Amino acid sequence: MKLCIIGHPVSHSLSPAIYGRFFERMGIDATYEAVDILPDEFAEEITSVAEHFDGFNVTIPFKEKIIAHVVSQVEPPLSAINCVFERRGYNTDWVGFGKPLLERSIEEPVMIIGAGGAARAVIFFLRKAGVKRIELLNRTLSRAEKIKEEFEILGRFEISVFPFESIREVASRSMSIVNASSLGMNGEETG
């Protein structure tokens, strides 16, 4: 079996080492590598990846973009995929984020930094967990407003949107904070 992780940048990913060791220890005949795809080359490159790999993980900045290229198994408004196998797209981010929190009380409001696929997964879990108030910060307000609109239409909770510059003010009143952005990743800001 041939597997990989796609994203940009992706050279910092520990996934190839982790999965390589796991496959070795479990006696699984599989390989796992990192494939860096430039955002401008995504449409051409994703076809090649789908043809040459049995499955792949998806990281920034492609978790939302990949949906148009696979058979999506995610329910709206999650609209982000982090795993593709046999050309079917799945999202395990929300479970990975939420499982450790199931036994705990989540204090509100929850501040989320970022408005990409990871933020969608966090909001998806928080909504299922009964959280009523989310404060969403992003550098591009239109992306945050889109998420607000898509999730609030389902009812049961409120998302307030703030520019990234409001981070200190919003953090001062937030009881829980989640960084779902690329900020701090590998010591770089990625967009």
Label each region the model flagged.
Residues E33, I134-E135:
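Conserved beta-strand positions in the Rossmann-like core of class I SAM-dependent methyltransferases
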Residues F157-G191:
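Rossmann-like adenosine-cofactor binding region
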